[in-house]
Each structure stands twice: as structure tokens, then as C-alpha cells.
């Protein structure tokens, strides 16, 4: 895992974003299974990305102790590989904070653009990424393990 010791404080006292560690793997695996299972077997894939030295990953911590979400960025290609927030905390700014954190790290590493894939039928994710400045640049059929089409989105940073 590419280590970055940068932490960000959240808007609420006790909230912060920190680099993911091996101790976060059970949380990441469980959340991946919960939110990505409609697309395929991501509960093993996402933890693999977190341990990959070509990736940077982070976890949002609430009240100083409870993980609420995570994000993984591939440094090699500038792609957000995964971003997820526990369902009860979605639409509270956690996803946006995680995305901004990765944009900051990407800029520090000299990246000029971020890419991501999101399911064609996932209108909530498309709206979230659109609000963050991402634009659809294409699509990829059968992108997900269960065969769904993904929209490819990018953002200059």
C-alpha cells in the first residue's frame, strides 16, 4: 500500500480522514460486500487494492473511532477505483470529503486528471460525481463482473 500520512479533519469535532491500514480490511470488506455486491464479488477485490503499493487508500472516521467510508485511488492511472460510505451515513458529506481528500493527494503526486467508472444505472453516483466536477467521457460495456455497463467519468485537477 502506498503510504501517505496526511490526515484531514472533518467538519465535526472528532471526525477525520486517515490512510487506510491493514486493521481496516474487515470494515472495507464488509462495506464493499454491502454496497457493491449488485455489481459482483468486490468484498475480496477492494481489500486487495488497499494492500497494493500502486494505490492510496483512506478511511473516514466519525467521532474519533467509527469508520464510515473509504476511498481507493490508483496512482498509476489516476483512477478512483472505489469509494463507499455506509448506507446510514450517505448524503452527509462523507463521500465528498473522501473525494476531496483523494484529489488533494493526487495533485500532490503530480496527477492532472482523475478517472472513475460508475454503473450506467447508478443515477445517484452519477449525480454525486457530476456535482464534484466529473464529466462522462464514454462507456464500457460489461465492465462489472455481473455484466453491467459503466460510464467512464473524468475530471481535470
Residue ranges, per PLM feature:
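Conserved acetyl-CoA-binding loop-helix of GNAT-fold acetyltransferases
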Residues: 91-104, 127-131
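Short glycine/proline-centered loop/turn elements that form peptide/ligand docking sites
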Residues: 99, 122-125, 142-147
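Terminal substrate-recognition subdomain of acyl/acetyltransferases
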Residues: 1-10, 147-157
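Active-site acidic-Proline motif in GNAT/NAT acetyltransferases
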Residues: 86-88, 92, 120-123
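Conserved catalytic-core motifs of GNAT/GCN5-like acyltransferases
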Residues: 115-118, 130, 135-151
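Acetyl-CoA-dependent GNAT
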Residues: 10, 15, 19-88, 99-101, ...
